[in-house]
């Protein structure tokens, strides 16, 4: 405390911080990026292991042999669906009852805030069908769910056939201690959300649905199944849920264990498992998988029906059967045995999955990075904001032109702004106007779509996207608006105080985001931190303005789309990338209003106003 109370030592510390601030910021930023890249190497990545004792052994004998029956069910389902043009509810009810299930239906409807051009729907109505296999060895206090989503663009008939065949097989076993729910949903995620809201007796998205007539126990785990054909070359697993939530790592380990036992090839992000982590090729392949997971998790989208279960504290996965040109193929029996083994092990659980990690990154199915090892990466990036804020704070509070050494000898002068007060209006005006622009970006696109369609020849979805872009671009005029009302008595100290507030605001936002969705926080910190530190009204303003635009939240989204397709080995042209960007904007707004995805409000109400503050600093007069 003596160092801070002694004015001479305090000034010496301020002088040292001001002198070393720039190299420390560069070093901290490079350390954050390097730490993230090093996560794929064995010293930081660990082998996965089963933490739950009840699932530690795979010594169960899978007896499923209903491949022919599953294919017959699939053919009948596809024929009835083609004939009716919708989900064959009556056929599903009749078939589920024939295999011994308690069968119930649920109707639902939802009017979207604007038409979904990706799936070509606006007024959505459908019916979910589910059957319950009651546990013969216990009361109906706990349950497991096997669900198959059926969308308008893909029937998923093979998965429905396998679900019905598994239901018939499970019905003949007597060892079940948990109820098993076999759920077929219409309209993909909309049907899943309607069923989950009704099951838990909540309404968080404005979905209109009929109450459930039959319930099982509290859902412990769920598996969503998607199959494109009756033979697969691999099973791809999706773990990313709504707002970046992840299932317990033990559920993923269970899937991998039974795939290995049955000889099934399993993939993550469509990538094969690296075989050798000691050479450079293994970590490089793991880096591709890790980046794909980071991009998918940062989007906040539920990448499968399982993503909506996670909101209700239900551990869930989505398994997708891939039929590629690989030589070795597996039939429905192999997939059914893997699912049977997973459900039999989950049947042994005495409590919810909780032993293993909920926050992790996956460079491969057999490797993971825990939260304690990846958080320093974003911590180093946020340290840059802290160092710059400390520098500005010292410049604002340390007055005088000559600083003395501890021995009394005068030291070289540190140029500091004159000791003047900062007018409150110089901070309040840009803060209020920036937040008002963010509020307009959040509210007006959906509210004003009908007005736009009346005056311009555009559809509702196009009107929403164009309004988003117009308001976003209008924020560039913010400095011209705020400079009319701010105080100009201390212009230098005014922009420094505004930047200090903006740095603290950005650091708090990125820190909170990184705690709940590390991938989103890290991506935004990687792009926004350097330009936030560099922004000032002096120097090459044109260069700083170009960098600030290229690292804005919208530009980060656009760059992420190009990187995503590049990692998938399907690069985009500029025109294709722009079209995908416009579609992503519409989907982001739609998923927020439909499922409660938080990416759109985070960007519009938080990060966009903060970015406007740095834009204001850059053009301060």
UniProtKB/Swiss-Prot annotation:
Annotated phenotype, changing residue 517 to Q: No effect on function in GPI-anchor attachment to protein
Sequence ranges on the Cytoplasmic membrane side: 2-19, 394-425, 484-495, 537-540, 620-621
Consequence recorded when altering residue 51 to L: In GPIBD15; results in low amounts of GPI-anchored proteins on cell surface
GO terms assigned for molecular function: GPI anchor binding
Paired cysteines (S-S): 259-266
Glycosylation site positions: 203
Subcellular location(s) of the protein: Endoplasmic reticulum membrane
Tissues expressing the protein: Ubiquitously expressed in fetal and adult tissues. Expressed at higher levels in fetal tissues than adult tissues.
Keyword Cell division among record annotations: no
Protein name as annotated: GPI-anchor transamidase component GPAA1
Organism the protein comes from: Homo sapiens (Human)
